[in-house]
Regions:
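N-terminal segments that mediate ammonia production and transfer
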Residues: 1-141
Length: 144
């Protein structure tokens, strides 16, 4: 079960990151999937940002099974092959953690449902977010 918390600061500066971490730390007891951020970014609106994972965070008492990093690499190769088959161009690629990736992609969004279903048909792969301005970032515990 997840929980939702938010911040709005109007006309003043604040240490938003620290405040968000405090709220997320308070939600951490709800389980390994409870901790994340949703951020709006300033983009040109042309490309999609896809955040996805090819494995699980096995820390923090997770029930997930520890996998060798090579398993993540194999799943990533399959994702890349599927993207190629769908006519997607990877503009930028970041590996945030061994199991967590962020792609900026160029894609003529014919059918995002079909796109998502194809990518998530790969065992162990889950799209966390896909959009042109909002990113959902879920990479583990709230405490840094």
């Amino acid at each position: 079960m997840c929980g939702i918390a938010g911040l709005i600061h109007r006309g003043k500066s604040s240490n938003v990151g620290s405040e968000l971490q405090g709220m997320l730390q308070a939600l951490k007891h709800r389980g390994e999937d409870s901790t994340g951020y949703a951020l709006y970014g300033d983009t040109d609106g042309k490309n999609f940002i896809m955040r996805f994972k090819v494995g699980e965070n096995v820390g923090e008492g997770s029930s997930s099974i520890m996998e060798d990093v090579s398993v993540y690499d194999e799943r990533k190769k399959i994702v890349d092959q599927y993207l190629l088959e769908l006519g997607v161009k990877i503009v930028k690629e970041e590996r945030v953690l061994p199991y967590s990736l962020r792609y900026e992609i160029s894609y003529d969004a014919k059918d995002l449902l079909e796109f998502s279903q194809k990518i998530e048909s790969i065992p162990g792969v889950e799209i966390l977010s896909m959009g042109k301005s909002l990113e959902v970032i879920k990479i583990g515990r709230a405490h840094v």
